[in-house]
Amino acid sequence: MAKILLSKENLFYNLDVISKKAGSKEKVAVVLKDNAYGHGLVEIATLAKEFGIKKAVVRTIDDALKIEKLFDFILVLAEKSFHTYSHTFHIALNSLEDIDKLPNNSNVHIKVDTGMHRNGIYPEDLEKAFLGLLERNIKVTGVFTHHRGADELSTDFFWQKENFSLVKKSVKNICEKLFLPIPLFHSCNSAALFRTENFDEDFTRVGIATYGYLDDSDVFNFPKLKPVMSLWASRLSTRILKKGQSVGYGGTFTTTEDMLVSTYDVGYGDGFLRLNERKSYTTPKGYKVLGRVSMDNLSLNTDDEKVCIFDDVRELAKIHDTITYEITTTLNPNIEKEII
């Protein structure tokens, strides 16, 4: 059956590069949302702990529960239903209206909208948020924001950095006024970290770089990272097609000579985005995908028992006119994973 192989060596290499840029392992929070960008939540969390990472970021409480014993600190980004809670969980407050929904005595990181206009409270509402949380005995353990264009060549990155600097000053003044401890500050995602000279925040939230990718790395002279994931498929059947015969739905690939063709057990049902006559892809070993990708299989000009479908998703991202994130996160979470 199809299988995802996860390279421990490559993951550790990436985490080492990230940790050195951040200043230490303690200043790195590995982002594990959406099944660790398709790589496997528990698998990547276990390896990150082994490397020495103590902070993680997930999407929901249910995700946090699966890795609760692996980290000292888990930031939950988008939870609305608090059926359980742990002292290691820190809940993102995305709007003022959510203050009344938070568990009593919980830890909260206030998200501030510094320009992305997606989630977070406005800077002018910070004191209102602190007072509302204080009334409910909820501890503000962090304040953060998210960059909308750190991986793009524009001034947005510097504009948002300046906005967050003003937020930090405001928060410090509020905490002094209310006799509260200064919370942790964090804003840098993968691209923002590597565009920041002399990183000085409390920690960085690193997602895609953990898994070996930094989009537009050539533009910013980012470090070369190593992809962690490779997707492998097993042979289902083999046949010899005569010259002029066609393969798959629609018969969009026709042989120009007698050809050996095998089907392999990966398809768009596994989250491998559909290829067709307008989207041509060749595997790392040089086998071209023939015709249309089906729900459960695809065809190649080989009879190898196992074939590496990809070990770097950047080429597929170009073919599908998308980003590396989408290629990995759309993979079916039920695909077997093996750490190598």
UniProtKB/Swiss-Prot annotation:
Its cofactor is pyridoxal 5'-phosphate. Pathway: Amino-acid biosynthesis; D-alanine biosynthesis; D-alanine from L-alanine: step 1/1. The modification N6-(pyridoxal phosphate)lysine is found at K33. Keywords: Isomerase, Pyridoxal phosphate. It comes from the Bacteria. SUPFAM superfamilies: Alanine racemase C-terminal domain-like, PLP-binding barrel. One of its GO terms (molecular function) is alanine racemase activity. It catalyses: L-alanine = D-alanine. One of its GO terms (biological process) is D-alanine biosynthetic process. The active site is at K33 (proton acceptor), Y249 (proton acceptor). Belongs to the alanine racemase family. Catalyzes the interconversion of L-alanine and D-alanine. May also act on other amino acids. This is Alanine racemase. The gene is alr.
